[in-house]
Design a protein with these regions (language model features):
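Glycine-rich, proline-tolerant flexible connector loops at the mouths of alpha/beta enzymes
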Residues: 38-64, 76, 100-113
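Conserved, mostly hydrophobic/aromatic
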Residues: 13, 33, 96
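Structured alpha-helical segments in the cores of large, soluble enzyme domains
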Residues: 26-34, 88, 92, 118-120
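N-terminal glycine-rich anion-binding loops that anchor highly charged ligand groups
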Residues: 2-7, 24-43, 47-56
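Acidic (Asp/Glu)-rich catalytic clusters
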Residues: 60-68, 85-95
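Generic structural signal for well-ordered alpha-helices
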Residues: 30, 54-61, 82-85, 119
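Non-cysteine beta-strand/loop elements that form the S-adenosyl-L-methionine
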Residues: 6-8, 93-104
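Active-site mouth loops of central-metabolism enzymes
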Residues: 5-27, 72-80, 107-117
C-alpha cells in the first residue's frame, strides 16, 4: 500500500486560534519538512490573504527552487477569475491546489453568485 503525505502546517495550521508564524519561522518549517523529514508535498499558504503571506510564499518558493523542491510546494488558490493564479505565479509558485465551493447552496448563499458566475 502507498501513502503520500501532504503537510498543511503552514496553511491550515496557521488558521488555529493564536497561531501565527513569522516569515523566518515559515521558511524554517518549510526547510525542516522538505529537507529534514523528506515530506513530498507541503502546502505553504493561501493566495491573496495578505502582503505578508505573499512575501512568505515568495521567499519559500525562491528557497525551494534553489534546493530543487519547488514542485513539492503547493499554494491554495480559489475560483476568482484568475486572480489567485496570478498571485501564485507572481510569488513563484508552480503547484496550485484549487478550492471551489462544493454545492450550489454555498455558491448562492455564501458567495451570492450564480453557479455560472462562480466558475467563470
Amino acid at each position: 500500500m502507498y501513502v503520500e503525505i501532504l503537510d498543511t502546517t503552514l496553511r491550515d495550521g496557521e488558521q488555529t486560534s493564536g497561531v501565527s508564524f513569522a516569515m523566518q519561522e515559515k521558511l524554517g518549517i518549510a526547510h525542516f519538512l522538505l529537507e529534514e523529514l523528506g515530506i513530498p508535498r507541503v502546502e505553504v499558504g493561501s493566495a491573496r490573504v495578505s502582503d505578508g503571506e505573499f512575501e512568505a510564499v515568495k521567499r519559500i518558493c525562491q528557497w525551494a527552487d534553489e534546493k530543487g523542491h519547488l514542485g513539492k510546494v503547493e499554494v491554495l488558490g480559489f475560483i476568482d477569475g484568475g486572480e489567485s493564479l496570478r498571485w501564485i505565479k507572481d510569488a513563484g509558485g508552480k503547484v496550485v491546489k484549487l478550492l471551489a465551493k462544493g454545492s450550489v447552496r454555498h455558491v448562492t448563499e455564501q458567495l451570492k453568485k450564480t453557479p455560472e458566475q462562480h466558475i467563470a
